[in-house]
Amino acid sequence: GDTHAGPSNLRYGFDNWIYGTVGYSRFNGEVNGKKHNFGMGVFRFKPDGSDIEFLHQFNNNTWGVGFNEAGDVFGSTANNNPTFFGGLPATVYGKERGKSAKMIASSPRFYPITPNIRQVDAFNAYTAGCGHAFATSSGFPKNWRNRRAFICGPTGNLLGMYDIQGKDSGYEAVNAFSFVASADEWFSPIVAEVGPDGNLWMADWYNFIIQHNPTPNKGRAGYDAKNGRGNAHINPNRDRQHGRIYRIIYQNHNSKAPKLGNTPQLVRALSHDNLFWRQTAQRLLVDNKRTDAIDALKTLTTKSGHGAIHALWTLKGLNALDQKTHAAALINPSAELRRNALRALDTGKPDATMLYDSANLADKDLQVRLVAFSKLASLPESDDHKKTASLLMQQPENAKDEWLRAALQATGAAELNIVGYKRGPNLLPNASFEEVGDNQLPANWTIRTYSRRNPDLNHAVETRKEFVKSGKNSLRISADTRHDSSLFARVRLKAGRKYVMSGWVRTENLEGTGNGALLGVHELQHAAKTKGVKKTSNWVKVETEFKNEQERE
């Protein structure tokens, strides 16, 4: 059968839920009276089976999920997408579909050391990709720790690597080539994980045929094969009896397993250098309801190491994470702890208040900000949350970042009605024309005329009080015949930002069928211009609001 299609990779999560992946076979069932139907991605369920959630949608069969030491979720797929980042839980979109994961690999290629490989698609790239374990112990070089991810490529007879690096609010993955590769055509790594000893353990399926399709026929393979019950073609070369397990040892590694016999030992193990033992200690404390650890756990959350993260989630699992401890974690110097403290917030009013009070919605660390935005999107829908998201969307740093923007859109960020909010600084140079240049025109302003330049067209600084709205000067453009003329100044506009342009206009005997006197952004034409003032009019304020979609000047 196609093992990529079904559920796999079950593991204990930072949040005390069980995580796993599933392929195209999907899950279509009911849990605690609620129906679910999902496939090809990452899901989680409570250990007691009372709830299940689909979190990250990938684009094909999924057979790999892994966590870095901050609890961020990554995964791999079978076909040409070896590393995904789960930037947002799919739950923030409600019943709608939105981006919850993205392939971050710089290249899906892999690098065999033999030409004798068998692939049916995605040639010379990961197809049948498996696993996504990080180097999360001292059993690896320091510059690999929490960065290097291992993805198996059995159709290339290799175990590959990617270097996972932070990028804006998310991550990128740089192809780091092969960690293990073989010329043995049966060598087929299908999973690699960091073991209890801190070393990398690798399972070799040791099989000549990896992929289930296509089915051979006489014209292509010399014989007509038949498909079995799992839709894979029947072949005597499929081996069901042999396999090998390798352990790859870093020579400078000397970490020892912790003692877990009593509560103090379990609390100490939350700070062990191997993520395996940190999660194991957390699970044992929660499953065995070790409430005698609560005081020590609260003390540990005030630290900034990895132990603080697991202490936080242990308290959460014991229903002992009080507001004081939680609020302190939200402002801890450790960005990784702040991220997890945000994830641990519930969606009720007290926790929503903590979210707003923490200032994490404006956190300098964009990855922290993403989790804060994600939590905002998870709160019950309200006008206040939508207004907050709309305000946050006006910040270019948020609007330009794909994950931050997606989270705010999921919250309901809308075009901001700027009336009633404090506006930013005036970006126009010499906006009141108070400074006059050597050419007797407003400094930093230039004439632009598209009509024929007749002698009757005149641009000047007006100083007579009856023709000045405020200050000492105004700009006067006059002519006896029709013209298309203006003065302009250069202003840099940022992408994803909303702008307001306003001013005061007075006209005398402005006739004709043209647009009249107005303000506008030439490059945006009708999308950014005020209404025109015609005929004879006393001072009237004109204003327009517009959204700029790309950087321009």
Enumerate the language-model features and the residues they cover.
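Beta-propeller blade termini and top-face loops
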Residues: G1-N254, N262-V267, L275, Q282, ...
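Short domain-boundary/entry signatures in modular proteins, especially
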Residues: Y250-S255, R423-L427
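Short boundary motifs at domain starts and secondary-structure transition points
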Residues: K256-L260, E466-F467
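Cofactor-/ligand-binding subdomain signature composed of acidic, glycine-rich
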Residues: H272
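Extracellular and organelle-lumenal recognition/adhesion modules and their flexible linkers in secreted
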Residues: G420-E553
